[in-house]
Amino acid sequence: FDAMRRDLDAQGNAAALDRHQAQALDIITSPRVRDAFDLSREPAHVLARYGHRLGRYPHQTVKTILYDWDARPFIQARRLVEAGVRVVTLRPGDWDHHSAAEGDIFFALRCLMPLIDRSLTALVSDLRDRGLENDVLVVLLGEFGRTPRIAQPGPGREHWADAGCAIFAGGGLRMGQVIGQTDARAERSRTGHITFQNLLATIYRVLGVDPRAQLTDFNGRPQYLLDDP
C-alpha cells in the first residue's frame, strides 16, 4: 500500500483520479486501514473466540486432499469496518464438493461447518458487543444453490439455480425470521421467488443507497442499479 501511494504521487497519476477513485485510494492507503491488517493488536481472548488459526484437515481416505480454514479474515473484516471500509468481502474455506475429486462431501462438511459456525458467530457477536450490530450487515451466501440429491459418483452436489439460501445478520434488520420456503425436497420455491436482485436491494438500502437509483454511464445512457429492486 505504501509503495503504491508513493508511485502514484511520484508519477502524478493520483491527480488524474476521479472523486470515487481518489476516495478508494485514500481508504486503502490510510494508516487506519493498514493497521486493520495487523492482528497482533488484537487481544489473545478475541483471537481465540474466532478460532484464530490456519487449519489443514486431511481427507479420511484421499490423503492428498486437505481442507483449509483460516479465521483471520473474519477478524480483519471487523477491523476494516471499524477503520471506515464500507464493503468487505471474504471467502472462507473451500466449498466446491462436486465429486470424489474434491473429496467426500459428508466428511468435508463435518470439517467445515463447525469452523464457519464458530467464526461467523464470533463475528456477529463481536459486532454486537461493540455496538455495531445496527450499522454493519453480515451476509453469508453463494451464487447458487446445490442439487437437493447427492450426485454420483461422489458423493457430492452440483450447481442448482432453482433454490438456495442466504444468511443475513445485523444491519438494523429484524432478526430471527425465515423468509421464503421450499418444498420438502428443497427443489423448488413454494412462496414465490426471492431473487438476487431482491437481496442486493436489501443490501443497498442498508448502505443508504436507493436501489431504484438511475445513473448515467460514460456514454450518457441511463442505467439502473437493479432491474428488479
Name the predicted role of every residue range:
Residues F1-P229:
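Ligand-binding pockets and gating/stacking loops
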